[in-house]
Amino acid sequence: MTATFDKVADIIAETSEIDRATITPESHTIDDLGIDSLDFLDIVFAIDKEFGIKIPLEKWTQEVNEGKVSTEEYFVLKNLCAKIDELKAAKA
């Protein structure tokens, strides 16, 4: 597991009161963990703050709604963490 995943999983557990032990890299934030849109906004805000980045959530949501990508592309944790790592690298 990556340091990014560990931090993101901790943020999810703290923000949504989901048991940290149930959060895996394969977890889908909505389908598996049942995180609603308001909690997800809180999680994204906390991730932005923790990593010093800005997740383009509006763009991602639009791409999913337009059928350009599947929800798994952005909302399965291992993929989300990879996107966070890309955003961190682009900022560095």
From Swiss-Prot:
Residues 2-88 form the Carrier domain. Pathway: Glycolipid biosynthesis; KDO(2)-lipid A biosynthesis. InterPro entries: ACP, ACP-like_sf, PP-bd_ACP, Ppantetheine_attach_site. 4'-phosphopantetheine is transferred from CoA to a specific serine of apo-ACP by AcpS. This modification is essential for activity because fatty acids are bound in thioester linkage to the sulfhydryl of the prosthetic group. One of its GO terms (biological process) is lipid A biosynthetic process. Gene3D superfamilies: ACP-like. This is Acyl carrier protein AcpXL. It comes from Rhizobium etli (strain ATCC 51251 / DSM 11541 / JCM 21823 / NBRC 15573 / CFN 42). The lineage of its organism: Bacteria, Pseudomonadati, Pseudomonadota, Alphaproteobacteria, Hyphomicrobiales.
